[in-house]
From Swiss-Prot:
Cellular component annotations (GO), alphabetically ordered: chloroplast thylakoid membrane
Keywords of the record: Chloroplast, Membrane, NAD, NADP, Plastid, Plastoquinone, Quinone, Thylakoid, Translocase, Transport
Organism for this UniProt entry: Piper cenocladum (Ant piper)
Higher taxonomy: Eukaryota, Viridiplantae, Streptophyta, Embryophyta, Tracheophyta
Protein name: NAD(P)H-quinone oxidoreductase subunit H, chloroplastic
Encoding gene, per UniProt annotation: ndhH
Catalysed reaction, written as an equation: a plastoquinone + NADH + (n+1) H(+)(in) = a plastoquinol + NAD(+) + n H(+)(out); a plastoquinone + NADPH + (n+1) H(+)(in) = a plastoquinol + NADP(+) + n H(+)(out)
């Protein structure tokens, strides 16, 4: 009897690019020896739209609708970083009420982003039920966004010196109700997921990153805090009014996929604490700095004449960016979102460099998946939490 020879050739598998509704149009070229991963090469750029170059030909107000297309699941953070840069360049003060509204919107957006991470992450490792559960809270969140901003996604709500509109009547009470309801939902998630033995088998000890290794790779956000590094820009930089609230930085020591899950679950609870404190202490006053209009560099054009007074198309306000350099950053759900801005005494930025957290966090993926099983790739990739809109820009 002839015994068939065993093939020992390596196999190359293409994973992706997938539809943007999942992790995005990311392609992985995976080299396998049986079920063992030998090498992994991420292929990026399918969603590249030239966002940095577009910024050099737009005023800040004109560019605001573009930035919501970076991380389209956490658009408040991209808006915040866009208006914070000219505010610091021009030393523009933000009213206290506007700062509180910003914090509330940012933390609601953080919860929405973590929910949209949790559902697909659980679906990746074979648990379908949480994927449907998270849409209950997501719909309530988007109802709050729609009532305040007019849009469920791509809100275009932040403005230089404040926000576009004040909170509508009854919105604060609705937000209080959501906070109380959501805390019970987090308890349900922990009962359903955290103590599940099958879930623990899939994530515990998978994709371990040490603290020093995380720093050397430039990781940030939950990827960094899950490796034992207590670093949160809301505590470090104290931007907006975060230093007025009582909350704790969520972190873990082990650095595996389970730790990254626990950090994000804990962050959702802490975000609720921040929102509740902000709702209770929100002051009165203006929601925008009206003095900002003095900085408008738009020339008096024919659009302001009597014949055009009933035409809605008007030149957008523009602000001159002084000739200096500035780096601004915020703690986004996926890590440190930063902008390096160079002004040139013009209404257009001379350089607008984006520091996306997902792009930098993704660089460690090939190292994490080596010598792991093929099924572990989706677990590790899901625990990183990437959105290709901000990775490719």
């Amino acid at each position: 009897m002839t015994v068939p020879a065993t093939r020992k050739d390596l196999m190359i598998v293409n994973m992706g690019p997938h539809h943007p509704s999942m992790h995005g149009v990311l392609r992985l070229i995976v080299t396998l020896d049986g079920e063992d991963v030998i090498d992994c090469e991420p292929i990026l750029g399918y969603l590249h739209r030239g966002m940095e170059k577009i910024a050099e030909n737009r005023t800040i107000i004109q560019y605001l609708p573009y930035v919501t297309r970076w991380d389209y699941l956490a658009t408040m953070f991209t808006e915040a970083i866009t208006v914070n840069a000219p505010e610091q360049l021009g030393n523009i003060q933000v009213p206290k009420r506007a700062s509180y509204i910003r914090v509330i919107m940012l933390e609601l957006s953080r919860i929405a982003s973590h929910l949209l991470w949790l559902g697909p992450f659980m679906a990746d490792i074979g648990a379908q039920t949480p994927f449907f559960y998270i849409f209950r809270e997501r719909e309530l969140l988007y109802d709050l966004f729609e009532a305040a901003t007019g849009m469920r996604m791509m809100h275009n709500y932040f403005r230089i010196g404040g926000v576009a509109t004040d909170l509508p009547y009854g919105w604060i009470d609705k937000c209080f109700d959501f906070c109380d309801y959501f805390l019970t939902g987090v308890v349900e998630y922990q009962k359903l997921i955290t103590q599940n033995p099958i879930f623990l088998e899939r994530v515990e000890g998978i994709g371990i990153i040490g603290g020093e290794e995380a720093i050397n790779w430039g990781l940030s956000g939950p990827m960094l805090r899950a490796s034992g590094i207590q670093w949160d820009l809301r505590k470090v930089d104290r931007y907006e009014c975060y230093d007025e609230f009582n909350w704790e930085v969520q972190w873990q020591k082990e650095g595996d996929s389970l730790s990254r899950y626990l950090v994000r679950i804990g962050e959702m609870t802490e975000s609720i604490k921040i929102i509740q404190q902000a709702l209770e202490g929100i002051p009165g006053g203006p929601y925008e700095n009206l003095e900002v209009r003095r900085f408008d560099k738009t020339k008096d054009s024919e659009w302001n004449d009597f014949e055009y007074r009933f035409i809605s198309k008007k030149p957008s306000p523009s602000f001159e960016l002084s000739k200096q350099e500035l780096y601004v950053r915020v703690e986004a759900p996926k890590g440190e979102l930063g902008i390096f801005l160079i002004g040139d005494n013009s209404v257009f930025p001379w350089r607008w460099k984006i520091r996306p957290p997902g792009f930098i966090n993704l660089q460690i993926l090939p190292q994490l998946v080596k010598r792991m099983k093929l099924a572990d790739i989706m677990t590790i990739l899901g625990s990183i939490d990437i959105i290709m809109g901000e990775v490719d820009r």
